Amino acid sequence: MYEQAIVIRNDLKMGKGKMAAQACHASLQAFLHAQKISSSAVSGWMNEGQKKVVLKVNSEKELLEIFKNVNIEGLPCSLIRDAGRTQIEPGSLTAVGIGPEKEEKISKVTKDLKLL
């Protein structure tokens, strides 16, 4: 089974719409990266219904640790930096998108995170 994980910073106190927008940015950018490096995972994910899971971290440090570990594992990913036009400071890191990839590969990095 394939999935995509989106990890959102919960400490920024973004509104629901802002969080949704950041999750969408992370999802799309990670998908585009996956198309370049793992087309078989993208095909599998598309055929299985595009499962997504949205998780949370409580700091920029935690978000960067996840991003580092995702890169160590060689998974397709994205790191989202907000432009700062609405609710949060310009340049704030808001989200990481991971995959699509096999669930067991993603869970190696995300297994300790809680659902948003």
Curated annotation (Swiss-Prot):
Arranged from A to Z, the UniProt key words for this protein are: Cytoplasm, Hydrolase
Cite a GO CC annotation.
cytosol
What's its EC?
Answer: 3.1.1.29
Q: What GO MF terms are annotated?
A: peptidyl-tRNA hydrolase activity
Its annotated compartments are: Cytoplasm
Report the principal subcellular site. Answer: cytoplasm
Q: Which InterPro entries match?
A: Pep_tRNA_hydro_II_dom_sf, Pept_tRNA_hydro_arch, PTH2
Q: Name one GO biological process term.
A: translation
Q: What catalytic activity does the UniProt entry give for this protein?
A: an N-acyl-L-alpha-aminoacyl-tRNA + H2O = an N-acyl-L-amino acid + a tRNA + H(+)
NCBIfam families from the xrefs?
Answer: arch_pth2 (TIGR00283), PRK04322.1 (NF003314)
User: Member of which family?
Assistant: Belongs to the PTH2 family.
Concerning HAMAP family, the annotation shows: Pept_tRNA_hydro_arch
Protein role: The natural substrate for this enzyme may be peptidyl-tRNAs which drop off the ribosome during protein synthesis.
This chain's protein is named Peptidyl-tRNA hydrolase
